């Protein structure tokens, strides 16, 4: 595309204001470094996700329900919530890092998988380094089980556990 980055940024801001998309920013303890990294973009209407990859559509679905859940906690309970993703210089990435703002509750990391049952190596990597609760949501999963400190849960069970 022959569009300036400034124009693309403006278009994204317009789409956000129209509630067509939302951004998930990178988590980093150093805010200056987090600002330099690109956000992930998700659609509020998953019907707009035009991808042949069912995993990408599923990740968008989980992101949508997670952001709704966190907004619900902010609006009804007054909690200070946050939703991010994590990616380091070595290329390790986890789909979501979030805090619910509930007193005494640790932040959580979440990896979304369409069919894989074994624990994601990146989820294990960040769980050990950040000492957070870790969950892997599996679309085609049919039972909940533990992989060490990581809980693998079917999508239907995870979505049912959210407030809205």
What do these predicted ranges mean?
Residues 4-14, 19-20, 24-164:
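A cross-kingdom feature that marks ATP-driven nucleic-acid transaction machinery
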């Amino acid at each position: 595309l022959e569009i300036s980055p400034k124009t693309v940024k403006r278009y994204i801001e317009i789409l956000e204001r129209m509630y067509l998309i939302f951004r998930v920013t990178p988590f980093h303890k150093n805010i200056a470094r987090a600002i330099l990294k690109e956000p992930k973009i998700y659609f509020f209407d998953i019907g707009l996700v035009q991808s042949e990859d069912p995993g990408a559509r599923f990740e968008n679905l989980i992101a949508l329900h997670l952001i709704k859940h966190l907004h619900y906690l902010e609006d009804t309970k007054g909690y200070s919530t946050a939703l991010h993703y994590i990616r380091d210089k070595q290329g390790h990435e986890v789909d979501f890092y979030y805090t619910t703002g509930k007193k005494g509750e640790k932040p959580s990391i979440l990896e979304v998988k369409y069919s894989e049952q074994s624990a994601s190596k990146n989820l294990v990597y960040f769980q050990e380094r950040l000492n957070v609760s870790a969950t892997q949501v599996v679309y085609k999963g049919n039972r909940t089980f533990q992989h060490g400190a990581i809980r693998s849960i079917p999508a239907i069970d995870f979505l049912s556990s959210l407030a809205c």
